[in-house]
C-alpha cells in the first residue's frame, strides 16, 4: 500500500531538516541493537533514519485481542507517514456478545469516538501495512506499556516505549506545549473535534515534536 505525505507532519519535517538534525552520513550510526543506541532520557536524543513513530487505537472486549481501529505512523527514513481507520464488517461482529457490544459502545462514546463499523480502509489492509512498516524500519517508537506489548506482537521489531522515560510528559501536557493545529488531527477526529486523548495521528505528531524539541534545545 503506498504512503503519502501527511499535511500534519509538514512543518515538523521541515524543521527536522532545517535545524540539521540529520546532516549527511556522519550523523547516522548503525547499531546491532537500536534499543541500546536510543536513550529517551538523554538531553540530546540521537535520531536515526530507520526509526518509525507509531500509535494505534482500537476496541477491547473481555479477553479478546485488541481490534485495531486506527493506526498512524511516521517513518523518519522517508519523512512520510499515513493514518488509517479500519472498516470492520459483519465477520468481525458475528461472535460479539451483548456484553462485548456494551464495551464497544463505551470505547466509541468515551475513548476514541470511532463507531465500530466506520472506516476508510478494509481491515484486511492491516497486514499489508505491517509488512510495509516492517520492511522500512528498524525500530518502532510509541508511548504506553500496553501499546508497546500489542505492537510487539504485531511486528518483529524492537519497540521503544517513551512512556518509560522519566519526565516524558502526558499527551495533555504535550498538547499544551505544542498547540495542536487542525492538520495535526486525522480527518475523522478533526470533524469530531476530539483530537485528544485518542487520535493516533495527533499523538505521533506530539511525540515527534517533543523528541525534536529535545534535540534542538540546548544540551
Kindly give the residue locations of the regions a language model identified.
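Proline-rich intrinsically disordered, low-complexity coils
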Residues: 2, 7, 40, 65, ...
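Weak global preference for isoleucine
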Residues: 21, 28, 45, 54-56, ...
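Conserved non-catalytic scaffold segment of RNase H-like nuclease domains
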Residues: 64-143
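Metal-dependent phosphoesterase core characteristic of DEDDh/y 3'-5' exonuclease domains
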Residues: 81, 92-98, 131-219
